[in-house]
């Protein structure tokens, strides 16, 4: 199975983001990809306005358009969007929270994974505006079981190990990874570690770096660092993007997953 990790840079306009996503999904499908992964916050970038104002359910125009395109092309798409969740009180204010949802859309599947681990770190508190999910999600594409995680989830190895124990051979990770000192090194280490922990392929699609490579390593990139990556179950980096928008491709070898798990039976521990 050929997978594509689509690295784009989205903004605050849902319709423009949808148009960009559809364009790149079509490009990846034309190049033979069966599973196409786009970043977290594809529908609306973080820091580009209130998330609840453009949040939609899986029956909204954003998700249904992606589903229609996926059906037309015969591919499965995973991408980040925001859906309405609940209302909470924070410091005397009423906040309409959203779910940070990874939409799963294809010919035979339409669902979503709600990010379990909200990004409450580095002086940021995502849980103020985003309700944490509770359930692990996996689905099948071309006879291969695919698990789903989102961005900050990658710091929690048990989620990846449990997905693998439930049958996942590939774990996709839509991401909007903030740039800053040491963040690229952390990203590379964590993606490789989760592949080794779960003896699964990791397919991580991130937002491109605002401002491109010239801004790399600075704290001014809160929405993306680029470097989308596919990591094999033995920790080998199969392909990695740079800072700019691009699409990367890799072939998933289920035999390699089986061989790695036989040689390195960490999931049995």
Which ranges hold each PLM region?
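Extreme N-terminal starter segment of soluble prokaryotic enzymes
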Residues: 1-4
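Short polar catalytic/cofactor-binding loops
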Residues: 7-14
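Cys-nucleophile CN-hydrolase/nitrilase-fold catalytic domain and related Cys-dependent amidase chemistry
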Residues: 14, 23-106, 178-200
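Short, acidic/polar
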Residues: 16-26, 155-161
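Short hydrophobic-aromatic micro-motifs
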Residues: 36, 145-150, 172, 202-203
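CN hydrolase (nitrilase-like) catalytic-core segments centered on the catalytic cysteine
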Residues: 59-78, 155-246
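Short beta-strand scaffold segments in enzyme catalytic cores
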Residues: 79-81, 100-104, 137, 228-230, ...
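Active-site catalytic loop in hydrolytic enzyme cores
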Residues: 87-166, 179-189, 193, 259-266
